Amino acid sequence: ASYAAKQINYHVMGYYPITPSTEIAEYLDLMKSEGEHDIVMIPADGEHGAAGICYGASTGGGRVFNATSANGLLFSLEQLPVQSGTRFPMVLNIACRTVSGPLSIKGDHSDIMYALNTGWIILFAKDPQRVYDYNICGIKIAEKVKLPIIIAFDGFFTSHQKRRAQIIADDKDVHDFIG
């Protein structure tokens, strides 16, 4: 997800890290420090604030990206139907895990179930290759139909796999594809 975001070179990422989606922001921050992208990364005071940053950037015409998990998704849930209802596109990655009960962080789909009726398009990726592919396609789809999109995948099982993924070698080819 982070490599695709780097290639897309979003305008803004409003974020508040939560396990197991934390690595997405960490890798983007590392790539930013090495000059690999121009994404304005805005750390929020919480997930609700991160959702507000993303919504505001999207209403301002920005190409926007975020990532969260579990209770982070629940904290931002109030804003999801607003964004889909006003038809502002963005990409939100959800590394799915259990909603704390009690304080479990095991992988399951209880968090994504809360997002099913928010009006967001949801693509579920079964492996890191599809996470990458869906992120590249996701922004194109979101901007074409004017709806935000969620790329969901299993927390830990998929989010932390260190498996080779075939990536598009030239960032320019990604830009040409998404427009």
Describe each model-derived feature in a short phrase.
Residues 63, 87, 97, 130, ...:
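Arginine residue identity/basic-tract feature
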Residues 149-179:
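Conformationally flexible catalytic loops at phosphate/diphosphate-handling active centers
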Residues 106-156, 167:
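Conserved thiamine diphosphate
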Residues 1-114, 119, 136, 155-156:
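Thiamine diphosphate
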Residues 6, 32, 63, 106, ...:
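Context-gated lysine
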